[in-house]
Structure formats: structure tokens, C-alpha cells
Amino acid sequence: MTDETTKNGPDATAADAAADAAAYVENDTVQEETAQPDPLELLKAENSELRDRYLRLAAEMDNLRRRTEREVKDAKSYSVAGFARDMLAVSDNLRRALDAISPEAKATADAGLTSLIEGVEMTERAMLSALERHGVRKLEPVGQKFDPNFHQAMFEVPNSEVPNNTVVQVVQAGFTIGERVLRPAMVGVAKGGPKPAEAETNSVFDEKDA
């Protein structure tokens, strides 16, 4: 055999195949190493996801806390609504008793009647004060623009000196409890006066907090 035959013989072919196989394995190993994600990047991604979950959970807990506080506050504020509404009937009767006494009768009343009148007035004031301590407040609508959210119009009063729909008389007092109307005020409103100003009026609650 010649040297050329020896180089190109079966041994050379086997050596080439082995070299190709080794190169393939090495290349595949490099590709696998390249395809594996960076552990640091994985930790960063996991940390970011956990942080997002924490922020969402914190926001949900804060909303739950606020909602619970509001519900507890409302429960305390409005738990006496039924009782307060019943007490308004008593207050109405006290006011009717006082209104039934004319100014002339008061002026000429003897000591006994005067004491009785003063006692009823003190009782009415004490009752309103007790209701106010529990968040029940009396509306004072005379002179205000009629607001159907707080007033119930019973009749119209011809009056050219004040704007139309101005409350000029209260038939039955109205009350609020917290941010709600416990009972609207029954009122008489002016008719025949100038057109009311277009400017917006503050609500009863805004005026109370001012």
C-alpha cells in the first residue's frame, strides 16, 4: 500500500467521523449552556412578581380597612335613626303646645302658666340638644332656596320681595342624621318674586361643615 492509500483508508474515515461527532457534541453543549436562563435574572423576575403581589394585597387591605371603618361609622351614626324619628313626634308635640299659646296669653300669663311655658321650652331645648349629641340636627330653611332633597313644599305664599322658591315659612321642622335626611322640612315657598340667581347654592351639609 502507498502512503496515500493509508491516509485515505478506513482509519482516516473513522477518525473524521469521530472528529465530527466530537464537534457536534461540543456545539450542542455550548447551545445548551447558552439557552439556560441567568439565575440572577430569574431572581429579579421573581422578586418583581412578589413585589407586585404585595402591592396589590396592601392596596386591597387598605380598601378593606377603609370600607370597614366607614361601615362601622355608619352603623354608629344611623343606629339611632329609628329612635330619633320617634322622638321627633314628641318634639313636634312640644312645639305645637308652645305655638298654641298666643303672644297676648304669654304676656298676661300668671306665674303658674309662665312656669309651665318655661318648663316646656326647656324640655324642648333639652330634647333637641340630646338629639344633636347623637348626630341629629334640625334644619333651618327659612330664607334658603327650596331644595327638594331637604324640603317638602306644602303651599306657595305670594311674596314679591324675595326670589321665587325661597322658603318663607316652616310648617314642620326637618332633621338630618349624619349625611342623611331623617325627615324633610315641610315648608311654604315664595311666589311672584324675582327669578332666583343661577349661582349654585351649597348643600345643607356643606354649610354645616363650613
UniProtKB/Swiss-Prot annotation:
Known function: Participates actively in the response to hyperosmotic and heat shock by preventing the aggregation of stress-denatured proteins, in association with DnaK and GrpE. It is the nucleotide exchange factor for DnaK and may function as a thermosensor. Unfolded proteins bind initially to DnaJ; upon interaction with the DnaJ-bound protein, DnaK hydrolyzes its bound ATP, resulting in the formation of a stable complex. GrpE releases ADP from DnaK; ATP binding to DnaK triggers the release of the substrate protein, thus completing the reaction cycle.
GO biological process: protein folding
Entry keywords, A to Z: Chaperone, Cytoplasm, Stress response
NCBIfam families: PRK14140.1, PRK14141.1, PRK14150.1
Self-association and partners: Homodimer.
A single GO molecular function term of this UniProt record: unfolded protein binding
Pfam families assigned: GrpE
Cited HAMAP family: GrpE (MF_01151)
Name under which the protein is recorded: Protein GrpE
GO cellular component, one term: cytoplasm
Chain intervals for the UniProt region annotation (Disordered): 191-210
Matching PANTHER family: GRPE PROTEIN, GRPE PROTEIN HOMOLOG, MITOCHONDRIAL
Keyword Coiled coil: no
